[in-house]
Amino acid sequence: MGSQPKRAAQEGAFETALSLLHRRGRIDALGTGGPELDGLIGGLEPGLFYLFYGSEDGGLPDELLLRLLVEAAARGRAVYLVCGNYRRSRTVLDSERLLSLIDGAGLDPDDALSRIHVVCAFSERHLIRAPDLVEEVLGRVDGVALVAVQQLAKLFHGRLALRREDPSEFTGVVSRLRELCFERGVVLAASCRPSGRGRPAPEPEGGSFLRHAANVIVYLRASRRGGTVSAYLVKHPDSARSGRMVSFSEEGWAWGG
């Protein structure tokens, strides 16, 4: 995959607005598989950090990560970091759903799965070490288009968090993952839960640093009556996009059937 952000940094400390516009116009963004969501965020640009959050019970953010894994496997490779203490929070890799999406995309299951490299973090200490494992994969294989992190904030935040490590370690994990992906021109996409309530969207779990670190933040919510999914764009580098919302049917959301 290309590494546009890294090359731009190497060419000089400054870049004109015109050259930036031309460069972004050539970027091969990763699609979500859903036209409404792609239209809202403009696809996922290499080197940027995307945070998708919503109710974990509804499963929308984690479902989206699975879709992104399939999109990445169709063009190259992906790293999937699964976070959560299984005994306390039942965080799992939904392999059946992933296979369903792969089949729906018309990909060969064995080939697609061989392109997805899984890293698991079952404790805060595991998560602190996870960036080293991700870096190892990025250095060992070519063509990684995506690093997806399921429930990034779960081990350090929330009522079931054990809190055995300094909270500042979480900041280090996010910074390291962001830096690794930016330098290599790889999309970083993470899911997390909302923290409390708020309108038009609650804050994402993970504290103020996570909100500032993410380049794009999207809140996903299913309608109370069912049948519809709403995506609210909380943050985007293009400020004109921020605050927009799209809705689409759950049938359209369930890529791959």
Q: Residue spans of the language-model regions?
A:
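Short, well-ordered alpha-helix to beta-strand connector turns
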Residues: 47, 76, 113-116, 213-215
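Helical mechanochemical/support elements of P-loop NTPase systems and associated helical scaffolds
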Residues: 33, 61, 94, 123-127, ...
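Phosphate-binding/switch region of NTP-binding enzymes
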Residues: 178-257
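P-loop NTPase motor core
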Residues: 132-212
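Short, surface-exposed amphipathic charged segments that create phosphate/polyanion-binding patches used
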Residues: 9, 127-137, 231-237
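Conserved inter-motif catalytic segment of the P-loop NTP-binding fold
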Residues: 80-161
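Hydrophobic/aromatic beta-strand patches that form the interior of the parallel beta-sheet core
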Residues: 50-52, 80-82, 117-119, 189, ...
